[in-house]
């Protein structure tokens, strides 16, 4: 009987310790709820623990995050992704941009396809759905990107076209923030990118491909008006968030302030953004920025690093829950 009591006491102590740790882990995210958009009548915001992380440990939480994305294993040349460029230190997830020596091929062996490396952290779970997603981030002071977005893998569907049954593939991407700390390439025909490090850059992409055809990118246009941030994205930490309201509506926020709404294309379906996604936290090179970082540009590790203070996710539940 005494052994049974001891076992029960030990179990109770373990459960109490676990509960206290769990409560502490998400207490900041819970406190942050007051800063979210007002919940619809009859609902309240609660923390979605699967995609919430304060990055206060000594290493990346492998139960929540892949240090190198299994969904997108190689970046856009000339930069690839390296797990060793990802770390957690002093309360931040850090992705450092580096020079590869020697340069690499697609297989990671010596080659000439990649000469730079960034990072691509991805959530382990891929069921992020309607809700609020936000990060507090400071971009690197480089011509490589600092980003926070959601996406999913293509699904196949058969349709009738021209009296024949053909296969189609579709996937979605929800870009909450894509920015760079420095802009060096300015296209006179596309001057919008001149102030890209000062703009709140968000998009929704509906990728679509028919059997025998090419994949097309259907990007929803948000507005002809550029939405500016308070200062350049590499100057300080700011929050970047979105409320994925439903299959047709996404609202975007900067430092808790509403910026704009994007309506994904309904060219192929009435409910384009109805599928769950995973989260991506990525630094990469863009094809339109021709002046990518040099070894000299990346000598300063602090300037070469994108810092993510936290990632927080929330979902709506009926108030009676």
Curated annotation (Swiss-Prot):
- Its domain of life reads Bacteria
Family membership = Belongs to the glycosyl hydrolase 16 family.
Q: Which organism is it from?
A: Phocaeicola plebeius (strain DSM 17135 / JCM 12973 / CCUG 54634 / M2)
Q: What class of enzyme is it?
A: hydrolase
**Alphabetical UniProt keywords:** Glycosidase, Hydrolase, Signal
Please list the residues that bind substrate.
Answer: 72, 76, 173, 178, 284
InterPro entries noted in UniProt = Beta_agarase, ConA-like_dom_sf, GH16
Q: What is the protein named?
A: Beta-porphyranase B
- Database matches in CDD domains: GH16_beta_agarase (cd02178)
- Would the keyword Transferase be found if you checked this record's keyword annotation? no
Q: What does this protein do?
A: Cleaves the sulfated polysaccharide porphyran at the (1->4) linkages between beta-D-galactopyranose and alpha-L-galactopyranose-6-sulfate, forming mostly the disaccharide alpha-L-galactopyranose-6-sulfate-(1->3)-beta-D-galactose. Some longer oligosaccharides of even number of residues are also observed. Inactive on the non-sulfated agarose portion of the porphyran backbone.
| Gene3D superfamilies according to UniProt | 2.60.120.200
Return the EC number.
3.2.1.178
User: Which GO BP terms, alphabetically?
Assistant: carbohydrate metabolic process
Task: Provide the catalytic activity annotation.
Answer: Hydrolysis of beta-D-galactopyranose-(1->4)-alpha-L-galactopyranose-6-sulfate linkages in porphyran
Q: Name one GO molecular function term.
A: beta-agarase activity
Quote the record's miscellaneous comment: Gut bacteria supply the human body with energy from dietary polysaccharides through glycosidases that are absent in the human genome. Beta-porphyranases, which are active on sulfated polysaccharides from marine red algae of the genus Porphyra, are present in marine bacteria. They are absent from metagenome data of gut bacteria, except from the genome of the gut bacterium B.plebeius isolated from Japanese individuals.
Query: Which residue positions does the secretion signal occupy?
Result: 1-20
Q: Does the keyword Acyltransferase apply?
A: no
Q: Where is the active site?
A: 173, 178
In what residue span(s) does the GH16 domain sit? 31-319
